[in-house]
């Protein structure tokens, strides 16, 4: 039962960006700039929080170093979103919503190699999905500024994905 619950939480976390986009596609509408800002901000806050958790709960120094990079990058990205949103007359969420807090909860119970493995696999899946969403927004966003932001953020997301994939190939310690 515990494994099933963990798998459900893992899949939910990994598929969040795609689900946000699919919800709008199902309604026949593209993701609005506000929807994209909300999704990006929630993801930034969640990844920064998970990265902070890794400082205490991960066992691998490589995972801790990677997680700190994500904390730094996603914190800076969140601040950039605030500037972008203010310029566009949009709002940025200031705290994690209930869905994102629920996605973080399973990580609170993990330590050591179990945390490392789950964290790395989650980052691979999450960044793969995020790259898809950001790529779409880089051409479909209503605002030229949002398009430019999505385009400019793609290399960082790719760096995060590449880093997580490299970690997944290292033997667990």
Predicted regions mapped to residue ranges:
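His/Met- and acidic-residue-enriched segments that coordinate or traffic transition-metal cofactors
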Residues: 2-10, 15-173
């Amino acid at each position: 039962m515990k494994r099933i619950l963990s798998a459900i939480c893992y899949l939910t976390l990994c598929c969040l960006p795609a689900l946000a986009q699919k919800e709008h596609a199902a309604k026949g509408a593209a993701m609005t700039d506000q929807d994209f800002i909300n999704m990006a901000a929630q993801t930034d806050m969640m990844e920064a929080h998970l990265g902070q958790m890794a400082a205490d709960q991960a066992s691998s120094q490589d995972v801790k170093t990677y997680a700190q990079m994500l904390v730094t990058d996603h914190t800076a990205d969140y601040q950039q979103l605030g500037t972008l949103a203010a310029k566009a007359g949009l709002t940025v969420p200031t705290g994690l919503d209930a869905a994102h807090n629920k996605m973080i909860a399973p990580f609170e119970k993990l330590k050591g190699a179990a945390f490392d493995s789950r964290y790395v696999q989650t980052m691979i899946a999450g960044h793969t999905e995020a790259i898809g969403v950001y790529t779409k927004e880089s051409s479909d966003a209503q605002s030229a500024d949002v398009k430019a932001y999505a385009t400019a953020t793609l290399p960082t997301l790719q760096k995060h994905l590449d880093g997580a994939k490299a970690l997944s190939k290292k033997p667990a310690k």
